[in-house]
Amino acid sequence: PQMNFFDATLSKKGDKYVATVQGKDFELPADKQEALKKMDKVPVDIIAGVRPVHIHLSQDGIDAMVDVSELMGSELHLHVNSNGKDVVIVVPTTDIDLDAVHGSHKPVKYSFKPELMHFFDKETEKNLF
């Protein structure tokens, strides 16, 4: 399946590991916290991957502007520009106000759950976990 890829950084803030994606920090889940403790190689630049269906609209999320929206039955496919990056978001139509986001040139905010993110080494492109 399609995936959105973001330049990101893994770092430690306090006693927790976070992935910083598009300027927003995402605290990693416990299994990845443990794996990173063993690796002991942060901060490090990475690539974060998120599938379009794992992205949700969120009032406190990352800013984006809708370029194109496609109503596909029970889903709305949003093609957005976020800080110069093209991102595809697929959201159930039952979860959103269609008038607020359907169409072009509409501002939206999006986010994702860290447990649904994939992390890749920036140089080798191999999965980190």
Regions found by a protein language model. Give the residues of each.
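Non-catalytic connector elements of ABC transporters
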Residues: 3-5, 9-129
